[in-house]
Amino acid sequence: MDHKHVEESDYKTFCDHCFQIEKNFLICPTEPRKENLDGVFQVNHSCNPNCGFRGQVVLVAMRNIQTGEEISYDYAMTDANLHDVTCADMKCLCGVSDCRRLITGEDWKNIDLQKKYAGFFSIFIQELILQSH
């Protein structure tokens, strides 16, 4: 594995911290160990996030963020199951009152989430939403 290509055998190690840019293009950290991650690779999911996306990887505030508040986004904004690329289902532990309890690569298809996060999906997911209508 080098910095440009993750071998299929290494994919499971890295995929928890990757951003899907296109069907077969992911931005991944060069080191999969959590203690070595920094920046956007450390942002957790929330079903009531304070951030979303502009473009592919620019994280922006969706509302005022309080001092000390954890930065979060909804993984539905970036992750999608497509044919041979499958995002692992994840039990959600965000703890908000409207928690979905299970995060999947199909969440971007949810009409309520599409309305809630309009303008804050990655370009990749925005294009999938447009194609699905």
Name these PLM-found stretches.
Residues 1-52:
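Catalytic cores of histone-lysine modification enzymes
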Residues 45-133:
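C-terminal SET catalytic tail plus cysteine-rich post-SET Zn-binding segment of SAM-dependent SET-domain
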